[in-house]
A protein has these predicted regions:
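Short cysteine-rich loop/turn motifs with clustered Cys
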Residues: 1-26, 51
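Histidine (H) residue identity feature
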Residues: 13-14, 26-29, 53, 61, ...
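Conserved catalytic motifs of the protein kinase core domain
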Residues: 23, 44-45
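Short recognition patches in nucleic-acid-associated and regulatory proteins
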Residues: 23-36
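Polybasic, low-complexity binding patches
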Residues: 36-44, 54-100
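Cysteine-rich micro-motifs
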Residues: 46-50
């Protein structure tokens, strides 16, 4: 079975995450809940091992530092890829994750 190619603007950050789907990987939306669809549309997804997703205490769903780091990297990637400002990011995603 072929691995499905998915749109992702995130930089590869091994061993934390990949920017491509790999066998057994879990897809994680950088900005979930109300922003999940926008994350998909904008390529703000990463691919994780099950342990780094939600199958251990180190997983992004249980590790605040990891989640915050991914959000910061996601905001930087979005601003760079789309040539947009912090204000435009906040208008789309509701929050600035970068230090001023």
């Amino acid at each position: 079975m072929a691995i499905k190619k998915e749109f992702c603007i995130m930089k590869n950050n091994y061993p934390m995450w990949a920017n491509y789907r790999f066998t057994g990987s879990h897809k994680h939306h950088i900005f979930g809940a109300a922003y999940r669809k926008k994350s998909d549309e904008d390529g703000l997804v990463i691919f994780l091992t099950p342990e780094m997703h939600n199958m251990s205490n180190q997983g992004i769903h249980f590790n605040r530092w990891f989640s915050d780091y991914a959000k910061k990297e996601g905001q930087k990637a979005w601003m760079e890829y789309y040539g947009k400002s912090k204000e435009e990011f906040v208008a789309r995603y509701g929050h600035n994750y970068l230090e001023d």
